[in-house]
Amino acid sequence: METLLLNDSKKIDDIKLIFESNEININLKNLIHIEDISSKTTGIIILRELKPSYLKPFVDYSIKKNIKVLAVGRALISLINTLKGTNEKVYRSFSGDRSTFISLGSRLAEIIGGAGPLKTNYLNSYEIPIENMPNNFLPSSINLNNGCIEAIELEGKGNIMGIIWPIFSSNKMPSRFEN
């Protein structure tokens, strides 16, 4: 099994260290061309904004072959534009707060082990209004203050998820759920 980091050779060593420090065995490789995807590929990580025309073949191939895709941070903007077939500005300046809501029954809730309201450990500089949600996607998490998207996932078949949180930074996302 291998996981591919899409066109981000500058960060690959940092990402490998994060996995290693958490005792997660990962075969992480840099991906530049669609031809670089092998039959052993199980996931693709996207960490930065990319042009929708560049990203689209990777997303389409991933859906066809059921390869997991995770778009992190500003890569979520690229993912949304790719899925909507546009290059428009889908974000605005951040007006929310550190409160978020993880949707019950979402894949995100399965991954982190719970759903409901929680506090994140950061304030972002941008937000994505809910009206920019691509077709066939569900909000996995929304900001409780402003209702903006913090995470999305493909409904039904497929394993595509995008999250606004900087999970590969030292500033981690939710530490606990609120009661």
Predicted regions and their residues:
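N-terminal beta1-alpha1 cap of cysteine-dependent amidohydrolase-like domains
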Residues: M1-R74, K84, S93-G105, A109-A115, ...
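Conserved catalytic-site region of short-chain dehydrogenase/reductase
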Residues: I77-L79
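Acidic/charged, solvent-exposed loop-and-adjacent secondary-structure segments enriched in E/D, K/R, S/T
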Residues: E88-K89
